[in-house]
Regions:
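Residues lining hydrophobic/aromatic ligand-binding pockets adjacent to catalytic sites
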Residues: 1-214
């Protein structure tokens, strides 16, 4: 049985969902120390001007090393409104935005207290829309020793790291993108880029992203 360990992630990239599809068991880390500038609170979409990072503000923890499970979402800067406007602006001309938008909009209207809960519920929705059924559990403690069948992707899947180097089993697959004529194909964006552009065919693309499927 193949087991993957992942960090919590906000509208995670295609690489992340490739693991959800291709591993038999997924553990989402709850006890790692929270770090900004990671997919824990950041997602990358494609707009008219190219890649655009969306970051969720968080409440500064009292302790310098705060477990991810205790990180609270801040209401600073009207971020929900800004994120939804950015998503709408980037994807309202895609083939499937109108079809899926009412599934996503409520996440930007409801206030969630904890970042992990917000990320988890969004992930559950995306899995349902793509039609994958990963076996996911939250970790009960921070794991440092891994069996041969367990792979640690908690820091490997990172917006500042080159997936070609850190994750050779991930093979990005080109698909239709609205702004491709301007910027060329942009690989490994947020899963919503794939979903809004490809709709039900997202699963077919995702199935090809694992080296084992080549």
């Amino acid at each position: 049985m193949k087991v993957a360990y992942l960090s919590s992630a906000y509208l995670a990239p295609v690489e992340y969902y490739s693991k959800l599809l291709n591993y038999d068991k997924i553990f989402i880390e709850q006890h790692d120390h929270y770090m900004k500038q990671t997919y824990r609170n950041r997602s990358t979409i494609a707009g008219p001007e190219g890649e655009l990072a969306l970051s969720i503000p968080t409440v500064k923890p009292k302790e310098p090393k705060c477990p991810m499970k205790d990180i609270r979402i801040s209401d600073h800067g009207n971020w929900r409104h800004l994120h939804w406007n950015a998503i709408e602006s980037a994807y309202n001309s895609t083939p499937f935005f109108e079809y899926y938008k009412d599934d996503f909009r409520p996440f930007y209207e409801k206030k969630y207290e904890f970042l992990t809960d917000f990320n988890e519920e969004l992930c559950r929705l995306v899995c349902e829309l793509i039609d994958i059924q990963p076996a996911i559990e939250r970790t009960k403690e921070y794991k440092t020793d891994f069996a041969p069948n367990e792979i640690d992707f908690r820091e490997a899947i990172h917006p500042k790291k080159d997936f070609h180097r850190t994750d050779p089993e991930f093979i990005p697959q080109p698909y239709y993108q609205v702004f491709e004529a301007r910027h060329g194909f942009l690989p490994n964006l947020s899963i919503i880029d794939l979903l809004f552009n490809m709709g039900p065919e997202s699963l077919l693309i995702l199935q090809k992203t694992c080296a084992d499927s080549q």
